[in-house]
């Protein structure tokens, strides 16, 4: 099993923590990670685009001129697609772009990105992140003590609301729990800051 250093909130190394090789030590599968990232990005699309077809455009109920005898082309409505201000043919309608991948694929992708971060030495384990009250300055001190100055995903245990509230005003910092951290979040971050309790939860969920 791989060992990573365990730090406290002041940046002092207090011990080490063993990581499960079946989760944090596998050969990353880039193809699977790519598929999951594309799936999660697709799910983020709003899909609220819409246009009006000829039945939705206002007006056009009356035939513009009689069928025969005018010398002009026959027309049934001024809202036909060929008219200016008419309905759109086969235009976009609101829809969801999201699609689901098999659970095994999603789990393998998570294991792959966690393993990649550990292998690249971009995985920082911390004993805990506890704050008496939501305080952005306190969270910034923790990051400074741990020499984290790049885009970071902080993974905490369930119920640690003060950590999330303390970090929400910091640029390039995102907080997630062990069960909500996504492959897209991990790929988009330069470093992972994970609490000891969150590591246990990750190993429990992905085992």
Curated annotation (Swiss-Prot):
Keywords: Ribonucleoprotein, Ribosomal protein, RNA-binding, rRNA-binding. Disulfide bonds: none annotated. It holds the Pfam family Ribosomal_L4. Residues 49-78 are annotated as: Disordered. The keyword rRNA-binding applies. It comes from the Bacteria. GO terms for molecular function: rRNA binding; structural constituent of ribosome. Gene3D superfamilies: 3.40.1370.10. One of its GO terms (biological process) is translation. GO terms for cellular component: ribonucleoprotein complex; ribosome. PANTHER family: 50S RIBOSOMAL PROTEIN L4, LARGE RIBOSOMAL SUBUNIT PROTEIN UL4M. Belongs to the universal ribosomal protein uL4 family. Part of the 50S ribosomal subunit. This is Large ribosomal subunit protein uL4.
